[in-house]
């Protein structure tokens, strides 16, 4: 990362620091505040007393006056903070929530303190006589007690010591102009006499002792009051965990630590540009007992001013820390440790007697310039020679061994990294025993600990932890990783393996090496997964090492041998597998990454104890991959820059089954996953750690959830995410709702809900915490021996690959760090820039000596999400709760599961050839095959795409242009793109620059997604497993069908209840659905009985159709607008401009092999009595579709297929229902879908041929014939005969005003085109060839009636009817008119009231009352029958049982996905809900039912007010008063703090009507809020959700991401409004555009349909002409 970013962070931190200081001054003297009344002062005093008492309860041992004074100071700060954050006096004095508010305030102050530690500048004065380098900017770099550093470098519990200034003005982009001058800056400052703010140290230190007592006796940190060395012997009692999770020192102590003790550990003070190659002082100051973070404890000083009692030549002096050294107390004998490199470092010792204090000035810059130590006169000649040559050779005399640096000129900057990386590791070696001779390692990291906030520390370490040398050749040659000469962070000096002489003769080193691994890991995990492949390559002699406990000698010796073997394996590997030690990231993105040793069993050996240093990294790797599995953020949106790259790796693993895959990190990662899945060892240092890690997270998460409501009340913002409530005192943004993407990821995400906690954002505001785990919850001290550092990486499932393109986007998860987030690799074996990926499997190794028993004592994040995310093994191993309903298999009995598997391998729906091919593949099943269907690779059908401007379908493999505009992606065909002469192309009325378009080929292919069993690790297709990726919120354990059968048979589990996974029967029933079901079941029973009678069998012996469910899944009120040109012709005749109607969608489900499969669907339009003529009381059967999977596949008595019988009965039942409700007619257009397109159900099976028009028409007529027999249908005719001709005694006027006007029908669109052509012809314009046929309309037909003036509307009407008749006549039989009531033969109206006058002699003649009156007044000649002498007598027949008004008693069922057939089809296409095979039809139907049971707008689905997770139907609890307060079951069970009563949300099965009404109310409320927002000008409007909607709209105006969660919410709201809006001047953003967009899409679809029909007619005419003999 560029160093300029560090400077930016510094500035924000400095500014924030002043704010905190100001607040402190105010809070410390509350009575001095002007303008506060005496009563208020008394109230505040009362609150101060209560706060003091609260603190005293937690400090029972502090009874002396000094301690009380310190507690009083802390109480003042807390009271002042609560006063500032309270919104009202009542809120301030609410003692019911006092405890929670205090705790919340502590957390907030913690964020400020960590971001703004007390600066040492105020306690320093300039050293007289020393040049200060005026003009330079000095950076305060407080020293940090890193015992609280977790493994992500999070300063969770940091106490700080300040006392350094370093000039930063000469540091830019990783270079240092004057290192010596900058390093000497600290020496120019001395402490201010008499200023000591360490008075409060013991108050906070006691809290630290209390909280971290569970860490097994962690050494006390630096503090001015700890002068007695005996304190170091005291170990805290185990098991003590403060419920708060934070001690006072953790939260406020940073500003009260002593500033007197300077950097006694000899670490380099560096500026905020952490990682600059300033390692010149990386020579140890002294060997003294130290705290676990490398900070010298004050207990090591007898007196502050006691002079050094060690020979000067034994002191490892850094001139930067010369002042600190001179003040240090008694020092033990010191050793100078040399530098260690990243690729094969050697730890050696140097006789300190050979060096003098005077030489240290040269030592300061030697590592930066490679000249300092060479000029040291006291350095032994052979050691100096070794150092100059960079040869890391182990000397026989251990005191004379010095780790050496490669001296190649191009690698000189990497030498700086060597000090950093290895001394940083040595630092932890000294943390084992307070009385052990420590070997402190001075390194760059300890300088970074002096930064003002933990984020800076993260950046510094991440920079140099990622930037490293990459092995470029198998011969162990290393190339230099340079990026424009910008090196951020110290970089490792490369050392070839030939320079490393491994020997198992140094077992004492091993334990310390383990500690190095721990410290390296604990300080670098924020860099993600840092491979430590070279940690086993240490060279040392046991003479040099500090004594270690005897009981570990044997194991240490074993480790030494293992390191040697590991190193050999590494050096024998190929170039892509050579091992290096340190990971670095150069600013421009180049990356060199180590690789695991060659060998298939490497990982298993590591996990079984062959590589002790691997355990820590294995955990880190798993945790990082678990985050990657869950993260749904886009490539540039995730907090982790490497997240997207890791997704690429996991996506590769998705398909990879090669035993020795050459893809980088694939093979090793799979091995680790395999072990993790099968590990049952209770002492496994990798698996047990993760399990215990979860348990501790649960405890912390429980506490935080209880504190949540109070935190929210302190900040008075809308609903916020948990992390922002906990860490920021300036929170006012609404937490994003969790939005489900329509398309689940191809691989199951085995992670749980997104974290409600945060990692520190190293680049943001110090108080800002990104989605992840709070740094405050990763506080963990490094304990002695068995200490386990906290793995910061959220435990995320790593064993299952996932799609890199996860939409939905939409859910952020734990970022591993801010620096190891740079994408490193694409689908290649090398990185994106030709370098290796940072996700090296070598990083999967950990030290074995970390005992499982200590894992329970880790005070790491204890959030529930970590527990949920670790769904890696079965419940018996991982202890996590199972989420029911992730797979439909859970409903099945073992017999049903076996039936399902057998059905999968039958490939029902495919052609015979394809089915046989797949069956043959199943016989040769490989390890890469699905364990259920036995086939490996299955691809979905390509989704059809259409040109936005012209609506033409883009052919397969054809080139086209695409662009994202608005909320959707648009496609432009080549002709339309070329026709746009300008530099823009019009897309939905918006000009889009051609430069934004991307040229693509329509050849995209999407493979089916996979899922892995948590028990047997077998892989299956998600479709085969009936896996619902939408229900898997990353928290579900999945058991494959085979393991499920075993568990059921062994009694370990039972099939879940049907209420867990709601099916078709659980959908709300309606009057219509009940009518259809009852009638269908009755008819099926009769048919089955008749079949049994004819076959001579009993009823049970004859197969019958069962398990059928019919439901109305959409029923919404709509308005059909008449097209403008047509309306202009009949405006004078009071023709209605719009027709209200109700659109309904009806689906039929049948349970096949245990799954309810959608087999049939139809959309209808019902125009009731509220519609004007000619649409009044009419029904339009707009679309009908079915798939050929109905069971049983038998014939009825009449010889037709049983499925045809069922579908006919549904239609007849619907017509019967309409007739009883008062509808008079039904209109059917028998038009099959276009080739390659579908009406409702997406992608039909190959065994089902698309019917020709005549076949489809016959199918409808056969149904109507049955309906006529049952007297449901009165008469059938066709559209042309009924409206276009006057046959018989018909006296109705032939006019287009009589034609029923339906949405999507053929003639309205055709009429509009004809009228447009007529107008163009009249104006002399050229006809539009695309819209009209070539034939020119003639006026001859009008001459006979004398209508020659086309400007007259009547003439236009006649001409339009004439032309329409010509078009419709060839296919008039396809437009079927069904009369449900009798039709008057004179006026052609359908009679629904009064009497109908019937002629007994004529079979089908009746007239209405009105026409009968006219008939009686006619002359005898014109009476019925016309042109006959004998006149017939007409008899009246009363019309009854027809409602005068049509009312629909069914509830409105509104759904975004089922609003129209196009919306439903788009849902299926976008998510690949296909019906081409039965196996896919089952899965698609399962997903359709999921959407049906979750009908609310996705962006505004109910979310838990505490954890922000989306609540599914029938889940959670809600407040009876607050409309927006809903909580999930998990949060409710842990206790909530809400003033009102909470009730359970009703389930779909318990209260279908209530749920339906609730959904409609919610949608109506949202529409009302949006309309209110358009007129609201109040900033603090109290209208419900007003500010939320305003925030969404503001976000949409500035968002550059396009497609984020907030944008999806905004667009969903706009669509919800636009579907119901009819205001032509609506001011809601995008309303008119959306309506125009939908209308345009519908018109294009209708145009394609009409064009196909015309083509079919022409083809039919051509065939007829060709077949006619001459």
Curated annotation (Swiss-Prot):
Residues involved in Zn(2+) 3 binding: 1504, 1507, 1528, 1531
Keywords: Activator, Acyltransferase, Chromatin regulator, Metal-binding, Nucleus, Repeat, Transcription, Transcription regulation, Transferase, Zinc, Zinc-finger
Record's GO cellular component terms: mediator complex
Localization of this protein: Nucleus
PROSITE patterns: CBP_P300_HAT (PS51727), ZF_PHD_1 (PS01359), ZF_TAZ (PS50134), ZF_ZZ_1 (PS01357), ZF_ZZ_2 (PS50135), ZINC_FINGER_C2H2_1 (PS00028)
Annotated residues for binding of Zn(2+) 4: 1519, 1522, 1538, 1540
Binding sites annotated in the UniProt record for Zn(2+) 2: 1399, 1402, 1424, 1432
Keyword Metal-binding recorded: yes
Tissue expression from the record: Rosette leaves, stems and flowers.
Main location: nucleus
Binding site for Zn(2+) 1: 1384, 1387, 1408, 1411
Polar residues composition-biased segments: 493-527, 538-551
SMART domains: KAT11, ZnF_TAZ, ZnF_ZZ
Record field: compositional bias (Basic and acidic residues): 717-734, 842-863
Zinc finger feature spans (ZZ-type): 1379-1442, 1499-1550
Listed GO biological process terms: protein acetylation; regulation of DNA-templated transcription
GO molecular function: histone acetyltransferase activity; zinc ion binding
Annotated catalysed reactions: L-lysyl-[protein] + acetyl-CoA = N(6)-acetyl-L-lysyl-[protein] + CoA + H(+)
Pfam families in the record: HAT_KAT11, PHD, zf-TAZ, ZZ
Ligand binding (acetyl-CoA): 1184-1186, 1203-1204, 1259
EC number, as in UniProt: 2.3.1.48
Domain of life of the organism encoding this protein: Eukaryota
Zinc finger (PHD-type): 970-1046
PANTHER family: CBP/P300-RELATED, HISTONE ACETYLTRANSFERASE HAC5
Function, as annotated: Acetyltransferase enzyme. Acetylates histones, giving a specific tag for transcriptional activation.
Protein name: Histone acetyltransferase HAC5
Annotated source species: Arabidopsis thaliana
Taxonomy of the source species: Eukaryota, Viridiplantae, Streptophyta, Embryophyta, Tracheophyta
């Amino acid at each position: 990362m560029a160093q300029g970013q560090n400077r930016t962070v510094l500035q924000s931190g400095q500014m924030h620091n002043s704010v905190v200081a100001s607040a402190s001054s105010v809070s410390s003297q509350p009575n001095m505040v002007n303008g506060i009344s005496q009563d208020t002062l008394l109230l505040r005093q009362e609150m101060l007393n209560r706060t003091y008492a609260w603190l005293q309860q937690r400090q029972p041992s502090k009874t002396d006056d000094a301690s009380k004074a310190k507690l009083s100071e802390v109480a003042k700060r807390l009271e002042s903070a609560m006063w500032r954050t309270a919104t009202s006096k009542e809120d301030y004095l609410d003692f019911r929530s006092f405890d929670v508010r205090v705790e919340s305030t502590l957390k907030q102050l913690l964020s400020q303190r960590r971001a703004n530690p007390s600066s040492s500048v105020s306690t320093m004065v300039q050293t007289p006589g020393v040049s200060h380098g005026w003009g330079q900017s000095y950076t305060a770099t407080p020293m940090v007690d890193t015992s609280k550093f977790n493994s992500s470098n999070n300063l969770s519990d940091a106490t700080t010591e300040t006392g350094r200034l370093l000039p930063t003005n000469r540091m830019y982009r990783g270079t240092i102009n004057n290192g010596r001058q900058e390093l000497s800056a600290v020496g120019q400052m001395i402490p201010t006499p008499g200023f000591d703010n360490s008075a409060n140290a013991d108050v906070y230190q006691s809290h630290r002792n209390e909280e971290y007592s569970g860490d097994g006796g962690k050494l006390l940190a630096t503090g001015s009051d700890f002068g007695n060395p005996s304190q170091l012997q005291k170990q805290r009692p185990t098991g003590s965990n403060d419920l708060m999770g934070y001690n006072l020192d953790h939260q406020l102590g940073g500003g009260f630590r002593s500033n007197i003790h300077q950097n006694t550990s000899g670490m380099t003070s560096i500026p905020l540009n952490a990682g600059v190659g300033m390692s010149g002082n990386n020579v140890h100051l002294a060997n003294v007992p130290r705290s676990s973070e490398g900070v010298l404890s004050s207990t090591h000083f007898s007196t502050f001013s006691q002079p050094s009692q060690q020979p000067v030549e034994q002191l490892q002096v850094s001139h930067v820390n010369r002042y600190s050294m001179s003040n240090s107390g008694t020092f033990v004998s010191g050793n100078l440790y040399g530098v260690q490199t990243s690729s094969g470092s050697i730890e050696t010792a140097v006789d300190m007697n050979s060096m003098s204090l005077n030489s240290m000035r040269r030592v300061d810059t030697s590592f930066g310039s490679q000249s300092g130590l060479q000029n040291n006169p006291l350095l032994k000649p052979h050691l100096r020679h070794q150092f100059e040559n960079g040869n890391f050779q182990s000397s026989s005399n251990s005191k004379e061994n010095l780790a050496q640096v490669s001296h190649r000129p191009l690698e000189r900057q990497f030498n700086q990294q060597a000090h950093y990386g290895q001394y940083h590791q040595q630092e932890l070696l000294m943390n084992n025993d307070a009385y052990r001779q420590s070997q402190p390692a001075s390194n760059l990291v300890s300088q970074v600990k002096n930064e003002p906030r933990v984020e800076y520390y993260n950046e510094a370490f991440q920079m140099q932890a990622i930037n490293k040398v990459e092995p470029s050749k198998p011969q162990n040659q290393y190339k230099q990783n340079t990026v424009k000469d910008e090196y951020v962070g110290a970089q490792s000096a490369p050392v070839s393996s030939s320079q490393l002489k491994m020997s198992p003769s140094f077992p004492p080193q091993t334990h310390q090496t383990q500690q190095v691994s721990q410290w390296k890991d604990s300080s670098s995990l924020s860099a993600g997964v840092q491979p430590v492949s070279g940690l086993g390559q240490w060279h040392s002699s046991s003479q040099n090492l500090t004594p270690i406990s005897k009981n570990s000698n044997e194991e240490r010796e074993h480790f030494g041998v293992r390191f040697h073997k590991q190193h050999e394996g590494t050096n024998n590997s190929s170039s892509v597998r050579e091992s290096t030690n340190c990971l670095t990231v150069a600013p421009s993105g180049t990356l060199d990454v180590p690789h695991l040793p060659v060998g298939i069993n490497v990982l298993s050996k590591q996990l079984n104890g062959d590589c002790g240093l691997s355990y820590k990294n294995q955990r880190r790797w798993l945790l990082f991959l678990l985050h990657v599995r869950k993260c749904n953020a886009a490539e540039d949106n995730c907090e982790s820059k490497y997240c997207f790259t890791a997704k690429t790796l996991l996506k590769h693993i998705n398909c990879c089954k090669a035993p020795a895959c050459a893809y980088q990190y694939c093979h090793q990662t799979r091995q680790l996953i395999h072990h993790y899945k099968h590990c049952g060892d209770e002492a496994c240092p990798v698996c047990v750690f993760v399990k215990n890690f979860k348990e501790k997270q649960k405890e912390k998460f429980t506490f935080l959830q209880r504190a949540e409501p109070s935190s929210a009340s302190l900040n008075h913002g809308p609903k916020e995410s948990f992390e922002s409530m906990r860490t920021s005192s300036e929170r006012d943004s609404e937490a994003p709702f969790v939005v489900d993407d329509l398309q689940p990821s191809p691989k199951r995400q085995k992670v749980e809900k997104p974290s409600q906690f945060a990692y520190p954002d190293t680049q943001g505001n110090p108080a800002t915490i990104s989605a992840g785990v709070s740094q405050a919850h990763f506080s963990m001290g490094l304990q002695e021996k068995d200490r386990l550092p906290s793995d910061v990486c959220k435990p995320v499932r790593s064993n299952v690959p996932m799609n890199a393109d996860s939409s939905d986007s939409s859910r952020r998860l734990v970022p591993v760090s801010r620096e190891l987030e740079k994408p490193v690799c694409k689908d290649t074996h090398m990185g994106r820039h030709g370098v290796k990926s940072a996700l090296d499997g070598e990083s999967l190794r950990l030290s074995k000596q970390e005992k499982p028993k200590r894992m329970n004592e880790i005070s790491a994040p204890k959030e529930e999400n970590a527990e949920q995310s670790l769904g890696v093994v079965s419940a018996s191993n991982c202890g996590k709760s199972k989420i029911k309903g992730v797979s439909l298999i859970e409903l099945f009995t073992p017999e049903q599961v076996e039936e399902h598997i057998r059905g999968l391998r039958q490939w029902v729906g495919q052609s015979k050839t394809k089915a046989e091919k797949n069956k043959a593949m199943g016989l040769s099943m490989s390890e890469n095959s699905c364990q259920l269907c036995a086939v490996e690779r299955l691809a979905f059908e390509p989704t059809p795409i259409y040109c936005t401007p012209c609506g033409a379908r883009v052919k397969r493999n054809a080139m086209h242009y695409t662009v994202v505009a608005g909320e959707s992606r648009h496609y432009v065909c080549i002709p339309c793109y070329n026709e746009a002469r300008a530099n823009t192309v019009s897309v939905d009325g918006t000009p889009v620059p051609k430069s934004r378009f991307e040229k693509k080929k329509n050849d995209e292919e999407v493979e089916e997604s996979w899922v892995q069993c948590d028990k047997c690790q077998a892989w299956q297709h998600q479709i085969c497993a009936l896996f619902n990726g939408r229900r898997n919120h990353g928290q579900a354990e999945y058991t494959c069908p085979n393991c499920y059968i075993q568990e059921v048979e062994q009694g370990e589990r039972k099939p879940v209840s049907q209420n867990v996974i709601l099916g078709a029967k659980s959908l709300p029933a309606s009057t219509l659905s009940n009518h259809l079901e009852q009638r269908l079941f009755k008819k099926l029973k009769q048919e089955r009985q008749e079949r049994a009678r004819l076959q001579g069998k009993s009823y049970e012996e004859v197969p019958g159709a069962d398990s059928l469910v019919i439901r109305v899944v959409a029923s919404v009120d709509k308005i059909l607008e008449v097209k403008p040109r047509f309306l202009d012709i009949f405006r004078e005749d009071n023709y209605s401009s719009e027709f209200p109607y109700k659109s309904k969608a009806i689906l039929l489900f049948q349970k096949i092999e245990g799954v309810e499969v959608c087999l049939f669907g139809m959309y209808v339009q019902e125009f009731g009595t509220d519609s004007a003529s000619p649409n009044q009381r009419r029904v339009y059967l707009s679309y009908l579709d079915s798939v050929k999977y109905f069971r049983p596949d038998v014939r009825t008595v009449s010889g037709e297929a049983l499925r045809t019988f069922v579908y006919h009965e549904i239609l007849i039942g619907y017509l019967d229902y309409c007739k009883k409700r008062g509808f008079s007619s039904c209109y059917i257009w028998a038009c099959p879908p276009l080739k390659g397109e579908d009406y409702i159900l997406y992608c039909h099976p190959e065994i089902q041929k698309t019917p020709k028009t005549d076949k489809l028409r016959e199918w409808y007529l056969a149904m109507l014939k049955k309906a006529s027999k049952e007297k449901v249908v009165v008469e059938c005719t066709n559209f042309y005969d009924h409206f276009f001709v006057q046959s018989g005694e018909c006296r109705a006027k032939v006019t287009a005003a009589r034609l029923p006007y339906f949405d999507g029908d053929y003639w309205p669109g055709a009429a509009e085109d004809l009228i447009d052509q007529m107008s163009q012809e009249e104006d002399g314009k050229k006809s539009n060839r695309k819209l009209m046929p070539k034939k020119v309309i003639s006026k001859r037909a009008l001459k006979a009636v004398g209508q020659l003036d086309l400007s007259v509307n009547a003439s236009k009407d006649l001409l339009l009817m004439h032309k329409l008749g010509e078009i419709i006549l060839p296919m008039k039989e396809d437009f079927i008119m069904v009369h449900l009531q009798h039709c008057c033969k004179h006026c052609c109206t359908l009679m629904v009231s009064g009497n109908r006058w019937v002629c007994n002699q004529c079979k089908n003649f009746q007239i209405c009352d009105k026409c009968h009156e006219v008939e009686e007044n006619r002359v005898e000649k014109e009476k019925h029958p016309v042109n006959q002498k004998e006149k017939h007598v007409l008899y009246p027949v009363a019309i009854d049982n027809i409602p005068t008004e049509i009312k629909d008693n069914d509830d409105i069922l509104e759904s975004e996905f089922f609003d129209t057939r196009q919306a439903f089809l788009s849902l299926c296409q976008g998510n690949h809900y296909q019906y081409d095979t039965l196996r896919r039809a089952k899965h698609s139907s399962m997903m359709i039912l999921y959407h049906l049971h979750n009908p609310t707008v996705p962006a505004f689905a109910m979310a838990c007010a505490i954890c922000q997770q989306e609540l599914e139907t029938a889940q959670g609890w809600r407040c009876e008063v607050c409309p927006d307060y809903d909580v999930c079951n998990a949060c409710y069970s842990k206790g909530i703090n809400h003033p009102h009563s909470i009730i359970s949300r009703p389930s779909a099965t318990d209260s279908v009507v209530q749920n339906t009404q609730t959904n409609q109310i919610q949608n109506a409320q949202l529409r009302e809020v949006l309309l209110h927002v358009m007129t609201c000008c109040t900033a603090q409007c109290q209208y419900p959700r007003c500010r939320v909607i305003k925030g969404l709209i503001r976000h949409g105006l500035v968002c550059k991401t396009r497609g984020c969660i907030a944008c999806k919410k905004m667009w969903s709201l706009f669509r919800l409004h636009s579907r119901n809006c009819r205001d032509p001047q609506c001011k809601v953003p995008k309303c008119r555009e959306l309506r125009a967009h939908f209308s345009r899409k519908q018109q294009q679809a209708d145009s394609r349909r009409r064009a196909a029909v015309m083509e079919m007619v022409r083809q039919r005419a051509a065939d007829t002409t060709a077949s006619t003999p001459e």
